[in-house]
């Protein structure tokens, strides 16, 4: 079955990508019924794609095979993931795309993070008594929807680095949405788990036909989404941000209690940023600046841990997990106090990473003792300026979002590391009627209780944890890392880097080594594989790891071997993710 799909897909893309025209009559055959044929590790000499869905990886890989570059492939992949992983990301959301330009050697971030509409207010997540509305309620309301940025981000990426048009790259995904594809276990579980949320909106007709959730192996057809993609193909991004669609989207948000208007959509624009940089054991790390907290606290935790010589302890020892947990507590305390949109608040970026502040935080970590009251420090002592906000304690009921991450590298040296999201599974659950676009709940990433760095304000971007990252050695990109998972993203990227560099693990082993995640004394998670006796030891010291393991993150990664001229792509085993290497035929 896979062979038939590949032949058809390749033939169609040959016409599209080589001829450069769009044959609107072209038909894409149905994809395979099984996803277990795809590789979780692959090697290529001419490029690599690693994504969270095999069909998206196929589409990205074929773009590369037919002469498109990594940026072209990334755009095609995002459209494909909107269809195949509709619960994770799409044009109703936003994200952070990091691009290394193989020609100029520059590294750039396209920030397509959603923004609050003009009508948003700091107290919009409080009830009439001034108490925070429970997260489970605010996450499905129109007030949770941020102005989507993904489509504008894709447009900007193609304008800056692309060699193929959006019109061309969106075409194959239109067929995938129209003709459908077999639902995998991940999507089937998500539909089942979130059917109540979906049943409230136009999404019920897509995912709950006849009132019953679609199941694994069923064909998911999304004709309304295909119609929207056709509008974008013919009219560009204006078809989304202006006109009839924009009115329908904003009216839908208002129907669910939000304030978004057509003007909010028309006024939206992306931000182009430089990454923040850090050094770690001979590597240079490029990662995300605010409004994502990911980069700052990834670098801060690496700096704190660097002097502890972590690899002197076994990778599954209680000592290693103790040092990780204590470091996470300190960094996540800082995150809760000082991180926000730098267009609105002062973020002490230099102070948080200052060597003297790092030493100050290191001194709070004791190998044999749990710090039972981890608190934010005062990074403002180490840089000019001051906070224009307070430290405000927030409710503990927030559920971490999901998101998707993927990464692409090509034979011209271009590299993309891209994390993209609608936040929770299926976002708010709100679908734009007749257009098939699922809307994000990104504004619940703001603080519910105002006064802090991350309070709601009009046109402000909510705090993010997305951490698309590229590591360099001798000024050459050698590794990409990223993950979904809300605030767990930072810890997933951290541990992958630690296991690969500090412990010297192969990339596959580093990606799959069991992870922990803890932000405070009341929030603990761990993956299957962390030894039970180690958990008992840690809990005996005062930690509070529970009795049941859970999956943390879903890392996608590419390593680049410049000496041998090869790319290795790695995704999680036992998933429907796929790494596909590109090996072009030589004459």
Curated annotation (Swiss-Prot):
Post-translational modification: Cleaved by autocatalysis into a large and small subunit.
Source superkingdom: Bacteria
Organism annotation: Bacillus subtilis subsp. natto
Active site: 403
Gene Ontology BP term (one): glutathione biosynthetic process
NCBIfam families cross-referenced by the UniProt entry: g_glut_trans (TIGR00066)
EC code(s) of this entry: 3.4.19.13, 2.3.2.2
Protein name: Glutathione hydrolase proenzyme
């Amino acid at each position: 079955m896979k062979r038939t799909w590949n032949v058809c897909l390749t033939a169609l893309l040959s016409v599209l990508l080589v001829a450069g025209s769009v044959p609107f009559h072209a038909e894409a055959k149905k994809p395979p019924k099984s996803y277990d044929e795809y590789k979780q590790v692959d090697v290529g000499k001419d490029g690599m794609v690693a994504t969270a869905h095999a069909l998206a990886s196929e589409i990205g890989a074929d773009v590369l095979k037919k002469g498109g570059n990594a940026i072209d492939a990334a755009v095609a992949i995002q459209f494909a993931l909107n269809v195949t992983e509709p619960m994770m990301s799409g044009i109703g959301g936003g994200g952070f795309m990091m691009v290394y330009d193989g020609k100029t050697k520059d590294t750039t971030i396209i920030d397509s993070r959603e923004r609050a509409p003009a009508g948003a207010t700091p107290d919009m997540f409080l009830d009439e008594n001034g108490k925070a509305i429970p997260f489970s309620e605010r996450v499905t309301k129109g007030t949770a929807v941020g102005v989507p940025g993904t489509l504008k981000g894709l447009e900007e990426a193609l304008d800056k680095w692309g060699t193929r048009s959006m019109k061309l790259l969106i075409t194959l995904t239109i067929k995938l949405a129209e003709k459908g594809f077999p639902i995998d276990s991940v999507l089937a579980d998500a539909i089942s788990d979130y059917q109540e949320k979906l049943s409230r909106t136009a999404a019920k007709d897509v995912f709950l036909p006849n009132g019953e959730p679609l199941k694994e192996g069923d064909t998911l057809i999304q004709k309304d989404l295909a119609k929207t993609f056709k509008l974008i193909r013919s009219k560009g991004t204006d078809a989304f941000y202006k006109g009839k669609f924009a009115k329908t989207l904003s009216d839908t948000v208002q129907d669910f209690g939000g304030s978004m208007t057509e003007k909010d959509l028309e006024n939206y624009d992306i931000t182009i940023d430089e990454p923040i940089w850090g050094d770690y054991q001979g590597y240079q790390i490029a990662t995300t600046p605010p409004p994502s907290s990911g980069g700052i606290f990834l670098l801060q935790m690496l700096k704190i841990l660097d002097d502890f010589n972590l690899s002197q302890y076994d990778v599954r020892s209680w000592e290693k997990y103790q040092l990780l947990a204590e470091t996470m507590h300190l960094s996540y305390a800082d995150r809760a106090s000082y991180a926000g949109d730098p267009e609105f608040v002062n973020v002490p970026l230099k102070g948080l990473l200052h060597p003297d502040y790092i030493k100050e935080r290191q001194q709070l970590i004791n190998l044999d003792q749990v710090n039972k009251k981890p608190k934010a420090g005062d990074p403002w002592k180490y840089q000019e300026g001051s906070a224009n906000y307070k430290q405000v304690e927030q409710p503990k009921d927030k559920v971490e979002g999901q998101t998707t991450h993927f990464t692409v590298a090509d034979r011209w040296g271009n590299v993309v590391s891209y994390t993209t999201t609608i936040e929770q599974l299926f976002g708010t659950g709100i679908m734009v009627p007749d257009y098939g676009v699922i809307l994000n709940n990104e504004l619940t990433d703001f603080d519910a209780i105002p006064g802090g760095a991350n309070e709601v304000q009009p046109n402000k971007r909510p705090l993010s944890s997305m951490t698309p990252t590229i590591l360099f050695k001798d000024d050459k990109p050698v590794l990409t890392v990223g993950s979904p998972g809300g605030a767990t993203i930072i810890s997933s990227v951290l541990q992958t880097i630690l296991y690969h560099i500090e412990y010297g693990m192969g990339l596959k082993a580093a990606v799959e080594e069991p992870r922990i995640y803890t932000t405070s004394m009341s929030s603990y998670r761990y993956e299957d594989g962390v030894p039970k006796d180690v958990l008992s030891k840690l809990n005996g010291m005062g930690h509070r790891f529970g009795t049941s393991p859970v999956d943390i993150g879903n890392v996608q990664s590419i390593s680049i071997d410049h000496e041998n001229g090869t790319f290795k792509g790695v995704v999680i085993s036992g998933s429907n993710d796929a790494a596909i290497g590109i090996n072009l035929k030589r004459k």
